[in-house]
Amino acid sequence: MDIRQVRETIEMIEEQHFDIRTITMGISLLDCIDPNIDRAAEKIYKKITEKASQLVAVGDDIAAELGIPIVNKRVSVTPIALIGAATDATDYLPLAKALDKAAHEIGVDFIGGFSALVQKGYQKGDEILINSIPKALAETQKVCASVNIGSTKSGINMTAVADMGRIIKETAEQSDLGAAKLVVFANAVEDNPFMAGAFHGVGEADVVINVGVSGPGVVKRALEKVKGESFDILAETVKKTAFKITRIGQLVGQMASERLGVKFGIVDLSLAPTPAVGDSVARVLEEMGLEMVGTHGTTAALALLNDAVKKGGVMACNQVGGLSGAFIPVSEDEGMIAAVQNGSLNLEKLEAMTAICSVGLDMIAIPEDTPYQTIAAMIADEAAIGVINQKTTAVRIIPKGKVGDMIEFGGLLGAAPVMAVNGHSSADFIARGGQIPAPIHSFKN
């Protein structure tokens, strides 16, 4: 490595907000299944605190050694609906509290996996878990919940979609931050290191390290150097920058897995913004030539960014996974917040952007008097985009306040202006229930 590359890396960290967003340890809880819920909770606490006892210390050591900030250390676990189903309990709050207690004990920022996979219907534990979510998120600090309601292979479980509209409303009513820790997915992935949607898939190894990187500021600085150049050069510049970012992510992941004695899983290539100025995906899109995110051309700019990030990242790391694209959370990106506040960006445009990016309607505040059926219909629209396009989509929305209010979450979650929703009813549509069948192109065999 020559001195120019060293200087480049230092600049990435000091001036362009480059960091490793998360080291996430995935832990299987299948060996914690017990017909007694209290014993299951004990086993869960014991396994997490044993396997992840050194996660935070190792993360801090690597950050100090490399001089690269590692912002979050997290844990994801087997979907709790699978563990709870073996018990006769009618509420999985004890399991949520066991997760929270373990997270506090080992010092991680979040623990994900209070989850259910219901893309084709409910099993015994699924409905119980879903109905436990509002209380579980209100009475814990670090637990994150997710529910997968659709997939390209299975279609969309519209009964679950209706239920999740209601649950999001209840969660927001019971706690200020609860809805920010709840994600509804279509095509959820098993190796996602990012919260709030992380869970440890049943096809994964017993314990795995997954890494999520962050570098919108680095990409923006690189694009500043190619102002006015063609899209070919733009794409190549993003690709090369993503390569550098991902290489560092792989190094951190390998070091962490070696020191913790567990398997290295994947690097998630997602560009994840923060509320800090200079760490915004929206500003990257504007650097391409848009006056403000949300104007015509935004979706095309996002398509170029997303694809070039993937191409550069895949070259840099032999194991990529997770969500891997560009995140467009409103509350966590100062450029997105500005675009909403000046009227350039609305929900309809955000929905179009989710056909391209790596998640969906993320960290968006809507009026608290929005009917649950409207929330469910928003979930259905997002799920349809994911199911038809064979990609992951998600909804993380917070019904709070009224249009124009600013909802403060604090920390990495930032603040969100409350956005207007379409006032016409979707209630009769949502009341139908049942399953939207899988699309014809899902039949590959």
From Swiss-Prot:
The residues forming the signal peptide are none
Alphabetized CDD domains for the sequence: RNR_PFL_like_DUF711
Query: According to the lineage, what is the superkingdom?
Result: Bacteria
The residues that cross the membrane are: none
Q: Which Gene3D superfamilies match?
A: 3.20.70.20
**PANTHER family assigned to the protein according to its UniProt record, in alphabetical order:** UPF0210 PROTEIN MJ1665, UPF0210 PROTEIN SPR0218
Q: Which family is annotated?
A: Belongs to the UPF0210 family.
Q: How does it assemble?
A: Homodimer.
Question: Which NCBIfam families does the UniProt record give?
Answer: PRK05313.1 (NF003700)
Protein name as catalogued: UPF0210 protein SUB1511
